[in-house]
């Protein structure tokens, strides 16, 4: 699979956050308003550019909107609740802010970075504070615990298991898209593979013949993924079919012929795959519960979110 998760490192986190919350100017349309804060098109595009390195365009926009709104809500709620950072946290925050600026100085200049991205020094300081306000807000609510049954149910509802053939439309040497003629050839090949699969030909053999060296080629359990982990087209394609059915999906990287596989306790691989994901699922469910609480606080304080769908 050509899609990867964003690295959970401090500098990458700041880059992802850096499209949220800057004051509007007359040159940019407003993409989103969260409370009193307007998010401009240039800010959103900077955020999008970070996600496009890891996701296709559709998923990048979806994730950008979600995380931009989520992070700005945290800031607005913290302000509304008059959350203050203690002296130790403020000291850590200043060190973190300095490390961010130093890292950009090593990469060509912090001031140039601000100018190129239409950002301000004060804004970068605000970005760095988001994780600290998150920690402060978490102290205002209890961290939920989940039963084994709840974790297993989440796994069954939010994870999918598939095998697929990828007919790529990306030149393996240059990384660029192939010509339109070659794209048409790829489409015809994918349609042939789909027809063969639907006519009962062994799908593992089709994978080996048409799509070796992919994420599911050497794994008999197939490829297992969860919400927002692949491109929107791939996820929606899988969700449109039942177990042991096939579909054809076009994406930025080519044409996927997908077979959806069962994922429940009747499958031999279920326990192994569940155990691999259990810790991640628990963390995800705790985070989801926290963000639901943030939204409740936002509602209580009258903090509204408006998205401009025309931009």
Regions flagged by a language model, labelled:
Residues 1-6, 10:
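Positively charged n-region of N-terminal signal peptides that target proteins for export
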Residues 189-232, 262, 268-272:
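Peptidyl-prolyl cis-trans isomerase
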């Amino acid at each position: 699979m050509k899609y990867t998760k964003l690295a959970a490192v401090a500098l990458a986190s700041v880059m992802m956050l850096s499209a949220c919350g800057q004051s509007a100017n007359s040159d940019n349309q407003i993409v989103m308003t969260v409370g009193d804060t307007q998010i401009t098109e240039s800010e959103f595009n900077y955020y999008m550019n970070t996600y496009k390195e890891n996701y296709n365009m559709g998923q990048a926009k979806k994730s950008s909107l979600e995380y931009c709104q989520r992070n700005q809500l945290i800031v607005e709620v913290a302000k509304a609740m008059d959350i203050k950072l203690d002296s130790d946290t403020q000291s850590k925050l200043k060190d973190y802010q300095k490390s961010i600026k130093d890292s950009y100085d090593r990469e060509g200049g912090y001031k140039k970075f601000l100018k190129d991205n239409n950002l301000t020094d004060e804004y970068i300081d605000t970005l760095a504070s988001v994780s600290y306000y998150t920690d402060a807000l978490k102290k205002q609510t209890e961290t939920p615990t989940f039963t084994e049954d709840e974790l297993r149910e989440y796994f069954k509802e939010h994870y999918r298991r598939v095998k697929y053939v990828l007919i790529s439309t990306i030149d393996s040497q240059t990384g660029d898209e192939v010509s339109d003629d070659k794209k048409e050839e790829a489409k015809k090949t994918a349609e042939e593979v789909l027809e063969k699969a639907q006519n009962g030909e062994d799908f593992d053999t089709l994978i080996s013949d048409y799509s070796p060296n992919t994420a599911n080629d050497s794994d008999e359990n197939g490829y297992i993924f969860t919400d927002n982990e692949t491109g929107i087209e791939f996820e929606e394609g899988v969700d449109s079919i039942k177990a042991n059915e096939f579909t054809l999906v076009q994406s930025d990287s080519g044409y996927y012929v997908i077979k959806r596989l069962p994922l429940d306790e009747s499958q031999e691989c279920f326990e192994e795959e569940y155990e691999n994901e259990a810790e991640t699922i628990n963390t995800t469910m705790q985070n989801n519960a926290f963000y639901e609480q943030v939204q409740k606080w936002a509602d209580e304080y009258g903090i509204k979110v408006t998205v401009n769908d025309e931009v």
